[in-house]
């Protein structure tokens, strides 16, 4: 860059400012939804992030000793995102856990539930879309599941119904009935009861699984998503 100062030619380097325009780093909070292997030692981490909404990031230099436990479903992380004007796939580094979630990780039932819920959100939330309040709501529910010690078998049903509300379509009788049929009175209980009481609604495994599948079809219809949840079978067997 050249400018004239009192008749003299002054040369100012713009390399640094140009670099800043191309790359900018931000610290953000993340919730892990899914990961995809990329090359020999990199991962694409699909997340729900506080700053960017539903977004995928490239993490380089991931080895077997890098602590893959960081990428378990619904893990709460914090990391530095480098934005680039040259690519829509931003890179991320410096990932650290924000909460150990020991109440979840020490329970096969809760781990299976988080695997299911993370997969639902991975498939339903659209890449690059920011849903106001979605991150905060999801984080609150993860910490709630982590803290509950008993009576959480109904948690995923409550989560799915609240997810529908967060997405902007509150379940009502007229449009919910075709999906849940005879189970509507039970679903109505879940929508009207406080959280703690909804966890105590008596359901056998078969009915609980049927309701979960029905609500998934309802969400699928309203989001125009192909919600083919692989982990549903595992959840169904575990809570049979």
Give short role names for the model-derived ranges.
Residues 1-23:
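N-terminal amphipathic/basic-hydrophobic helices that include classical n-h-c signal peptides
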Residues 19-43, 48-240:
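Non-catalytic alpha-helical scaffolds and adjoining flexible linkers that form interface surfaces
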């Amino acid at each position: 860059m050249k400018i004239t100062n009192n008749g003299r030619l002054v040369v100012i380097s713009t390399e640094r400012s140009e670099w800043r325009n191309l790359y900018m780093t931000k610290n953000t909070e993340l919730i892990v939804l899914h990961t995809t292997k990329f090359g020999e030692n990199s991962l694409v981490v699909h997340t729900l992030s506080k700053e960017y909404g539903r977004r995928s990031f490239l993490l380089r230099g991931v080895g077997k000793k890098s602590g893959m436990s960081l990428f378990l479903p619904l893990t709460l992380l914090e990391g530095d995102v480098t934005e680039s004007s040259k690519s829509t796939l931003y890179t991320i580094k410096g990932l650290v856990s924000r909460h150990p979630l020991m109440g979840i990780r020490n329970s096969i039932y809760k781990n299976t539930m988080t695997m299911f819920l993370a997969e639902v959100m991975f498939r339903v939330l659209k890449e690059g879309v920011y849903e106001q309040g979605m991150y905060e709501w999801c984080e609150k529910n993860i910490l709630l599941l982590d803290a509950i010690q008993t009576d959480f078998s109904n948690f995923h049903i409550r989560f799915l119904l609240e997810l529908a509300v967060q997405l902007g379509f509150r379940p009502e009788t007229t449009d919910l009935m075709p999906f849940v049929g005879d189970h509507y009175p039970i679903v109505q209980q879940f929508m009207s009861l406080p959280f703690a009481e909804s966890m105590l609604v008596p359901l056998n495994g078969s009915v609980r699984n049927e309701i979960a599948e029905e609500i998934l079809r309802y969400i699928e219809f309203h989001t125009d998503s192909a919600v083919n949840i692989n982990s549903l079978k595992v959840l169904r067997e575990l809570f049979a």
